[in-house]
């Protein structure tokens, strides 16, 4: 059925899913290249040949420029894949107004037989005026009600309800809650992030996505308008974004900007291409610069699309393997703005833990590196577990030696609770040492001091809260610098 969304795999709050449309199934996370059919630097066939089975175009511009009745958008674009149409809201953001009503453009999108359609919302944009933001939320919600009769009677399309509010997070929350209530709309989308992303204000973007996602149903696919840079994609996918659209690939190409999975370069800055796509294998940066403008733009645009597709595939693989946290941790060091976004995500670790699957089909080892790793769901879950357990005895032994030596140490110890020390999990009850994820965890040989200090504090907090009267430590001098004082406190 059109609009059905089946989740196939999950990691953190991100997921791989299948959206059912009348023109076929879409696997998410998915990127919709923005297409302007009236500019020919790169053809739809070129994009299709890269493996893209979907695109987005502007219904308002097509209506305005053609000035004729189009029977079918697929025939007009000569594209049989999934077509999403925007309504002209971006033009409102740019120019302040457009010459079409909400109902007119919605009827037009229906009549040209698009697959996924957006009604004419009013973008909040990057305004600092709360009154303007309130007005954009109010009008966006009103316009959804205005065309609800069309949407409810249209079973062939997925209709998208935008969420507005901009930098005013309480308005984003209200807009998200109200949008989610409207069951006629099978897809939700966060509007107005384009300017935020252009300014590299990724920390605010993370807040906006989190607030929106945490207040809507997990059963509806969630779209991010304007999300076209690979280095931010995995972070918002980790929060639950399922699809993106952007013209960045062509806009950047026109400006000689070269997208990589970690950052954006100006073509003039490069001596070597850090990529092995067909374009980068054939040309050097110098050779590409010497080509005519139109040809260079096309080739750069194709490269940029290759990179976006490659990034999405890497993210999906990370989700499959349960390594999305490790992946975004690695991505964080690509740019200071991305690092700020990663730090902001860590503040939402309880949200990530809530939706992260406890165990996946193929159990894989997890990698822990530094203090940031303590925010991944497995660690959060472990400390929540420690909070819930009760002591069985008044005395406890904490063993810091290698696993293979543990059984010898505890053989004759009865009437005592025994824990294995781990520099990231803190304390692991002895009967769980071979349970996932403890036995499947890898970490550096040398542990950062800030990690050890944090773990020491967690151990003190744990033994105090459980009411142990005596604690013995075995082989812990290497890890716990204040071990003597800790032991004395509980002896």
Curated annotation (Swiss-Prot):
Residues that, per the record, bind substrate: 121
Cofactors that this protein relies on: Zn(2+)
NCBIfam families in the cross-refs: arcsn_tRNA_tgt, tgt_general
Catalysed reactions, as listed in the record: guanosine(15) in tRNA + 7-cyano-7-deazaguanine = 7-cyano-7-carbaguanosine(15) in tRNA + guanine
Entry's Gene Ontology molecular function annotations: pentosyltransferase activity; zinc ion binding
Active site annotation, chain numbering: 86
Family of the protein in this entry: Belongs to the archaeosine tRNA-ribosyltransferase family.
Alphabetically ordered keywords of this record: Glycosyltransferase, Metal-binding, Transferase, tRNA processing, Zinc
Pathway field: tRNA modification; archaeosine-tRNA biosynthesis
GO cellular component: cytoplasm
Signal peptide residues on this chain, from the entry's feature table: none
Example GO biological process: tRNA wobble guanine modification
Cofactor binding notes: Binds 1 zinc ion per subunit.
Pfam families in the cross-refs: TGT
Domain of life: Archaea
Function of the protein: Exchanges the guanine residue with 7-cyano-7-deazaguanine (preQ0) at position 15 in the dihydrouridine loop (D-loop) of archaeal tRNAs.
InterPro entries given in the database record: ArchSynthase1/Queuine_TRR, TGT-like_sf, TgtA, tRNA_ribo_trans-like
Enzyme type, top EC level: transferase
Name of protein: tRNA-guanine(15) transglycosylase
Binding site for Zn(2+): 275, 277, 280
EC number, UniProt record: 2.4.2.48
